[in-house]
């Protein structure tokens, strides 16, 4: 009899102390679009105008053009990465930017 009452008492304590699980509301976060990229330092560029066969050609020295191209590739990578990241989190909004 003592064992039965001990079992009933312990079951009563376990059931009596339990609570219903609280429902946690999941908040969706939509990150903002990144800030615009700053322009290339144009002071580094040395544009040149050359006239060849009566036609004017605008260009820059080879070393400057390579640095400029590296910067443009970095900009392209940055924009692609940011767009991919932001579109992943904003896919519920079905924006035209993310298609």
Curated annotation (Swiss-Prot):
Where in the cell?
Answer: Host cell outer membrane
Q: Give the positions of lipid attachment, kind N-palmitoyl cysteine.
A: 17
Signal peptide feature range: 1-16
Q: Where is the lipid attached (S-diacylglycerol cysteine)?
A: 17
Which coarse location class applies to the principal site listed for this UniProt protein? Answer: host cell
Entry membrane topology: Lipid-anchor
Q: Which UniProt keywords apply?
A: Cytolysis, Host cell lysis by virus, Host cell outer membrane, Host membrane, Lipoprotein, Membrane, Palmitate, Signal, Viral release from host cell
GO CC terms, sorted = host cell plasma membrane; membrane
**GO BP field:** viral release from host cell by cytolysis
Which residues, by range, are in coiled-coil regions? none
Q: Which residues lie on this side of the membrane: Periplasmic?
A: 18-99
- General function of this protein: Component of the spanin complex that disrupts the host outer membrane and participates in cell lysis during virus exit. The spanin complex conducts the final step in host lysis by disrupting the outer membrane after holin and endolysin action have permeabilized the inner membrane and degraded the host peptidoglycans. Host outer membrane disruption is possibly due to local fusion between the inner and outer membrane performed by the spanin complex.
Assembly behavior: Interacts (via C-terminus) with the spanin inner membrane subunit (via C-terminus). Part of the spanin complex which spans the entire periplasmic space. The spanin complex is composed of spanin inner membrane subunit and spanin outer membrane subunit.
This one is known as Spanin, outer lipoprotein subunit
Q: Which organism is it from?
A: Enterobacteria phage T4 (Bacteriophage T4)
């Amino acid at each position: 009899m003592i064992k039965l009452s001990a079992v009933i008492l312990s079951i009563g304590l376990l059931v009596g102390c339990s609570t219903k699980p609280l429902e946690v509301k999941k908040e969706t976060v939509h990150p903002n679009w990144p800030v615009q990229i700053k322009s290339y330092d144009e002071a580094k560029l040395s544009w040149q105008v050359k006239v060849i066969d009566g036609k004017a050609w605008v260009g820059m020295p080879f070393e400057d053009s390579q640095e400029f191209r590296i910067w443009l590739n970095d900009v392209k990578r940055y924009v692609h990465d940011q767009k991919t990241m932001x579109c992943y989190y904003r896919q519920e909004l079905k924006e035209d930017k993310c298609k």
